[in-house]
From Swiss-Prot:
GO terms for cellular component: cytoplasm. SMART domains: Cpn10. It comes from Clostridium perfringens (strain SM101 / Type A). Signal peptide: none annotated. Together with the chaperonin GroEL, plays an essential role in assisting protein folding. The GroEL-GroES system forms a nano-cage that allows encapsulation of the non-native substrate proteins and provides a physical environment optimized to promote and accelerate protein folding. GroES binds to the apical surface of the GroEL ring, thereby capping the opening of the GroEL channel. Its main location: cytoplasm. Heptamer of 7 subunits arranged in a ring. Interacts with the chaperonin GroEL. The gene is groES. InterPro entries: Chaperonin_GroES, Chaperonin_GroES_sf, Chaprnonin_Cpn10_CS, GroES-like_sf. It is found in: Cytoplasm. PANTHER family: 10 KDA HEAT SHOCK PROTEIN (PTHR10772), CO-CHAPERONIN GROES (PTHR10772:SF58). Keywords: Chaperone, Cytoplasm. Transmembrane segments: none annotated. This is Co-chaperonin GroES. Belongs to the GroES chaperonin family.
Amino acid sequence: MSIKPLGDRVVIKRLEAEETTKSGIIVTGTAKERPQEAEVVAVGPGAIIDGKRTEMEVKIGDKVLYSKYAGTEVKFEGEEYTILRQDDILAIVE
């Protein structure tokens, strides 16, 4: 079984946040800032606008930066994912 997003939605898996600051302080649990970098694991077919399907700009495997509070968090087969709209993705990291 897999997650297949609809329309212009994208499924991402957050990359782990740094656990140590640049100055060497170890950050725990609630003090960690929510990461905004993720890997794309599934991509919808694109939104339909004026009867035409739009092309998606991201693809599976892309590393992306996304809006801090965007999307809906879901748990699927023991893993945590976020489903968001392509518009909530700010950039592709190369």
